[in-house]
Amino acid sequence: TTNGKVNGDKIKYKKVDFDITINIAKSCKKKNAKKFLFISSAGSNSLSSNFYLKLKGEIEESVIEIYNSSLFIFKPSLLLGSRKDIRIVEKIGQVIMSFFSFLLPKKIKAINSSLVAKVMLDFSISNLNGVYIIENKEIINHFK
């Protein structure tokens, strides 16, 4: 979700981001899904002073408690690609990060959402077990 969609209400934002992810993880575990994959964020950390990064870190920790095997957490930086809705601040960030892409280290470089999807698909059909945290740089380099 976005801050705009919940009018800046952090409780509503958390309800969407946290509750939906956790409920899906619980449901998948209950139905004996072999793997669980989800997208978090580069820089996520449950101890962060930034609301968004802290929330993403809390989600990761909670999902790890539920799904401690065959779990894949993808942590891309700013996602590039088309959206149905217009996110002005995000669009500005995409333009700026794309322009300066050659200067940025891979760990924070903007990444195309289609690449993230392809890497997720590749991990979903792998034979890997355990908890895997796939950082932005690893996503970028996955098929190289």
Write out the residue ranges for each language-model feature.
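Short amphipathic alpha-helical segments at helix-loop
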Residues: 5-9, 43-44, 101-104
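Internal, well-ordered alpha-helical scaffold/interface segments
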Residues: 22, 26, 34-37, 57, ...
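NAD(P)H-binding glycine-rich loop region in Rossmannoid oxidoreductase-like domains
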Residues: 1-23, 27-30, 124
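Oxidoreductase cofactor-interface core, primarily capturing Rossmann-like NAD(P)-dependent enzymes
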Residues: 46-143
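SDR active-site strand-loop-helix element
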Residues: 36-42, 74-76
